[in-house]
Amino acid sequence: MKILVTAFDPFGGESVNPSYEVLKNLKDNIEGAEIIKLQVPTAFYVSVEKAIEKIKEVNPDAVLSIGQAGGRYDISVERVAINIDDARIPDNMGQQPIDIPIDPEGPPAYFATIPIKEIVEAIKKENLPASVSNSAGTYVCNHLMYGILNYIHKNKLNIKAGFIHIPYLPEQVLEKPNTPYMSLSDMVKAIETAIKVIVKAMA
């Protein structure tokens, strides 16, 4: 079994992106599944292109994308990706789509096909905060989640896919008073726990 895990590069003036730091620290094999790691740029269109290229190359059984959601307190397992880009800031390639459909011919939304409730409960059993999120936003994270699910749907592929948002790292909030954060080791544990649930669900 192969699980493709994607993460983003830093954006919005940050020097690190916790998703990529987590990605680098994931085990290469979890519950017998090979973990394939891919960094994608925080860029609307290129992020999906890079992910699809890798999906074609490795034919994974599941794709789990991770992204930073600065300001969130917990591990947020996304339920749904919506068919709209509405960027409050430009992406890393200077693109700033406002109220633009991701795919004008696509459905309004896609639901994650990974077991979101089971993932949340498993992370909580590790004594880490987690919840189901009903909005992945309208920036690059939502765009990537929608783009991957759209590609899988259109090509009738038997691949599960979903997205998890994670908080800031401690070093990112030194100048951001009263902003939540989580340690790297806890976030790695949470994502590895999520992957274990995904693997077991497909076994």
Swiss-Prot record:
Its EC number is 3.4.19.3. One of its GO terms (biological process) is proteolysis. It catalyses: Release of an N-terminal pyroglutamyl group from a polypeptide, the second amino acid generally not being Pro. Keywords: Cytoplasm, Hydrolase, Protease, Thiol protease. It is found in: Cytoplasm. Its main location: cytoplasm. GO terms for cellular component: cytosol. The active site is at 78, 141, 165. PROSITE patterns: PYRASE_CYS, PYRASE_GLU. GO terms for molecular function: pyroglutamyl-peptidase activity. HAMAP family: Pyrrolid_peptidase. Removes 5-oxoproline from various penultimate amino acid residues except L-proline. Homotetramer. Belongs to the peptidase C15 family. This is Pyrrolidone-carboxylate peptidase 1. It comes from Caldanaerobacter subterraneus subsp. tengcongensis (strain DSM 15242 / JCM 11007 / NBRC 100824 / MB4) (Thermoanaerobacter tengcongensis).
